[in-house]
Amino acid sequence: MTPEYFLRSLLMMILAVFSANASNWLYLAKLSSVGSISEEETCEKLKGPIQRQVQMCKRNLEVMDSVRRGAQLAIEECQYQFRNRRWNCSTLDTLPVFGKVVTQGTREAAFVYAISSAGVAFAVTRACSSGDLEKCGCDRTVHGVSPQGFQWSGCSDNILYGVAFSQSFVDVRERSKGGSSSRALMNLHNNEAGRKAILNNMRVECKCHGVSGSCEVKTCWKAMPTFRKVGNVLKEKFDGATEVEQKKIGSTKVLVPKNSQFKPHTDEDLVYLDSSPDFCDHDLKNGVLGTTGRQCNKTSKAIDGCELMCCGRGFHTEEVEIVERCSCKFHWCCFVKCKQCHKVVEMHTCR
């Protein structure tokens, strides 16, 4: 494959990413690298309707690989968090990558938008701290001595830069259209909730200095939570998401709980407009793979149990042989040696 052909192919894929759906940029996760976007002329060829994205590309060529990594993080975390649910974040080789699931105003779409905006903020911030980007570095506003008496030092994660870039890049489609439709307001709210899942869970990491670890001096820095922590927080918000509707207060359109008996949602909560399908049956047109063939837990009464996972269709049971580590022993010094044991277990899959 010639460099020219590769570049043309890459441009066609990225052009598709910036069309139609606001979450189509997630398709960048399926590209091995976007390093070929290294000249402003390349960005000019992105003839998508959102010119501000083209301008961002031109001004931030080096950041695009972090956007790709953010998309990968988002998809991987979504698949982990929903691994035991009927909808398990399966991706398609088409646009949008989650199918039409994200084009509906469901709570699943709310999670996808939140984890995606968080993924970009996280990946860009990590690139800043790693010294991979010229435009940003560590957070130099964190310095001096803290009220607790330790010295701020090291490389504090520049989360504000990552959040600002995520806002500019991820929110651009909704904001370019005025951001006043019900769906635009929903997307913008969930995008921000995703970023707040990082901001509100920043932690302080420290290192002791002194003779024999006496900690005569302690230096600390601010660090982002793990992305697994971010995913856990947003999954909890998904479980307690608020169904909303649009209401006009004065000249401003806002989202309010559809049930007036419910308390107003906060900036950290996820919101949705439409009820979710049951995800039971195969419907590739809408990006729903169904649950036929999915593994289930025979003894569980939760959503991963065979009764709920299989939507009442029943399940198959077969015996399979697995190999696992066993009889592990620690040997001085310093390794663990295990045997391989063969074990026959029952595996249950939905009809």
Swiss-Prot record:
It comes from the Eukaryota. The keyword Lipoprotein applies. Its main location: secreted. Induction: By Notch signaling in the pronephros. Glycans are attached at N88, N297. Residues 1-22 form the signal peptide. It is found in: Secreted, Extracellular space, Extracellular matrix. Belongs to the Wnt family. This is Protein Wnt-4. It comes from Xenopus laevis. The gene is wnt4.
